[in-house]
Amino acid sequence: DKTTHFSLHPGSEALEITLMSRHGVLPEADFYCPIPWEPLEIATPAALEAAIAEGSDALLDRIFELIVKELEYAAPGWSEAIGLRQLTPDSIADAWFADRLTHDPFQWAQRNLQEVERNKREHHTVPWRYAILRLHEAIETVVPQFNDADSRRFRQGLARVFIDNYAAIPPESIRRLLALHRAGILRILTLGEDYELQREPDRTLIVHHRQRCEFDVFIDARGQKALKTRDLPFPSLRQQLLACGDDIPDVGDDYTLQA
């Protein structure tokens, strides 16, 4: 029995954990795929360079056309089922999450975990997941070439698909989340786009959908700005990095600083 169970220590019965996000979905489990990654067939480096060479106007739409062709080549059945030909860089994220948003997130996580474990046993790669994974890395090189309008469109649409697919977590982490939920400890709170976060000395308040939630401990995992070298809390390392004078210092194969 691979089922993970969670039991509270005596005196910890009051423990409650809440995961919060705008859409209320859990990350999916890491999926089986070949490593090293196979090359893309349509969205090749040459094809991407040719799209860039046409200029920044409508670049995102040209790149998306390559993405559509790559997915149709790799996963024709999935592409037809999701209506890929009718989607745009702006609407693909809504189509990507549509099915998940109609299901309980923990039930979805349980089914996804079972699928991932079965595919791992059978060495089966889900073609559309694998194609999106490889496209993510390829398209990353194009993003700096987008104009301001396309950059905004990319972040609000297509980037959400890449991030969700890339941010899959180990199956064991999914098992632990499910165990915490079964134990009545873990829940998910869907905040939506319009919420307020108020920090107070002894608590954090979240206001959403005309509801008010209070938390004794709040961990902000939205992703903070990178620290500057001078902000590092390790004096000796900070001094050595500052002395080298570079934003990214030279390091050896064993990651020691080079003089």
Language-model-detected regions and their locations in the chain:
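Flavin (primarily FAD) cofactor-binding/catalytic cores of flavoenzymes
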Residues: 1-259
